[in-house]
């Protein structure tokens, strides 16, 4: 087997057994192929939904977009190469990719963890201080934060460009750690602290305070409003994504800590644990689109619309478009818009009715004919694509 991945894996082939047929040489690449397929399709759809119609204009959407970019880069640039360490006897991709692949693994891992920490702070400010945080929670500041995220990610992952190198080992060309053990241990500890421990602490603190505020709101009217329900929905979705990140990357970091500070003998059992930690951590890059599809009605509609367009079918029911008279504009995240008072009232109506004037609640309705008279002055027309 090829030598790559976590510290202490230098004798992975010996741990996996001698000659003969290795089941992991078939099973693991198939699982990596599944991760690659689901992750590529899912994250591409997420980016398409957010970019379609200029919807990535809120701070939350920009952070979700950045998370999708990091996951897609990881899937495309890392997973195919890492899958070969269980099938090929040596590293066949050259010295440059030996360094670049591992650098990209840690670059995207840092970017994902920093993005989740940033979006947790964004959700806390949006819910706890909705008015005072408006000047801070702007698309421009979100883009600046994303730039800072990638800058810090480059800073912390840059040393991995020299951490690994291609060399000859037992008549095989392998890609393995080149640093001395003390330097590798210091680097791995720094990676654990800055890419996992600190972001997890930020996530835990912000979401604990956010959930406490949401579920202990003293104003029953505000607590039952559509805006509050929308904020709860988007917070729940981001919380699930953050929890999955913590759980999926935990085995990877636990294994590394065991290598440096515990007992990690090279046996078939520890070899299986190493494979499992790889699969679980890499699978994190393909689960987020599944979470979005399960939690967000907007993403489900967007996925169906894009897939229907690719298949050459007209998406939607009946006319495929609906109209609504709404006062003002909506600038929140995709989840907040879909859970706004407008949509809650339309669902409660149970049937489609003509759009009333501005003095009455607005209900989604089929697009009327030319004889329909528009809303009064001061109202605006909101056109919604229905998948």
From Swiss-Prot:
Coiled coil: none annotated. It comes from the Eukaryota. One of its GO terms (molecular function) is galanin receptor activity. Expressed abundantly within the central nervous system in both hypothalamus and hippocampus. In peripheral tissues, the strongest expression was observed in heart, kidney, liver, and small intestine. One of its GO terms (cellular component) is plasma membrane. Residues 50-60, 122-141, 209-237, 282-387 are cytoplasmic. The chain crosses the membrane at residues 29-49, 61-81, 100-121, 142-162, 188-208, 238-258, 261-281. Receptor for the hormone galanin and GALP. Receptor for the hormone spexin-1. The activity of this receptor is mediated by G proteins that activate the phospholipase C/protein kinase C pathway (via G(q)) and that inhibit adenylyl cyclase (via G(i)). This is Galanin receptor type 2.
């Amino acid at each position: 087997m090829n030598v790559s991945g976590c510290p202490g894996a230098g004798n992975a082939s010996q741990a996996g057994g001698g000659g003969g047929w290795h089941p992991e040489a078939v099973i693991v690449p198939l699982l990596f192929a599944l991760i690659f397929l689901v992750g590529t399709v899912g994250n591409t759809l997420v980016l398409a939904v957010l970019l379609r119609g200029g919807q990535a204009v809120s701070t939350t959407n920009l952070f979700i977009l950045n998370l999708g970019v990091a996951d897609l880069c990881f899937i495309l640039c890392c997973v195919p190469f890492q899958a070969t360490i269980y099938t090929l006897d040596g590293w066949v991709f050259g010295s440059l990719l030996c360094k670049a692949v591992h650098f990209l693994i840690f670059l995207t891992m840092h970017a994902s963890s920093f993005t989740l920490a940033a979006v947790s702070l964004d959700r806390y400010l949006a819910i706890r201080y909705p008015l005072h945080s408006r000047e801070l929670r702007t698309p421009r500041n979100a883009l600046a934060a994303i730039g800072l995220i990638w800058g810090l990610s480059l800073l912390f992952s840059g040393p991995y460009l020299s951490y690994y190198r291609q060399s000859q080992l037992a008549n095989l060309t392998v890609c393995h750690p080149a640093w001395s053990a003390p330097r590798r241990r210091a680097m791995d500890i720094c990676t654990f602290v800055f890419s996992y421990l600190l972001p997890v602490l930020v996530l835990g603190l912000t979401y604990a305070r956010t959930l406490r505020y949401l579920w202990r709101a003293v104003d029953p009217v505000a607590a039952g409003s559509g805006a509050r329900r929308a904020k709860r929905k988007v917070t729940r979705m981001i919380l699930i994504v953050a929890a999955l990140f913590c759980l999926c990357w935990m085995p990877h970091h636990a294994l590394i800590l065991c290598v440096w500070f515990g007992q990690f003998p090279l046996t078939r059992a520890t070899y299986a644990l190493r494979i499992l930690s790889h699969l679980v951590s890499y699978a994190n890059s393909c689960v987020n689109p599944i979470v979005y599809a399960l939690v967000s009605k907007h993403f489900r509609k967007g996925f169906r619309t894009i897939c229907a367009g690719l298949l050459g079918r007209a998406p939607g029911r009946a006319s495929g478009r609906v109209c609504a008279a709404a006062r003002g504009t909506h600038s929140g995240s995709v989840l907040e818009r879909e859970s706004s008072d407008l949509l809650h009232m339309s669902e409660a109506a149970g049937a489609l009715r003509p759009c009333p004037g501005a003095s009455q609640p607005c209900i989604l309705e089929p697009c009327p004919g030319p004889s329909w008279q528009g809303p009064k002055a001061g109202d605006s027309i909101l056109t919604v694509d229905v998948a």
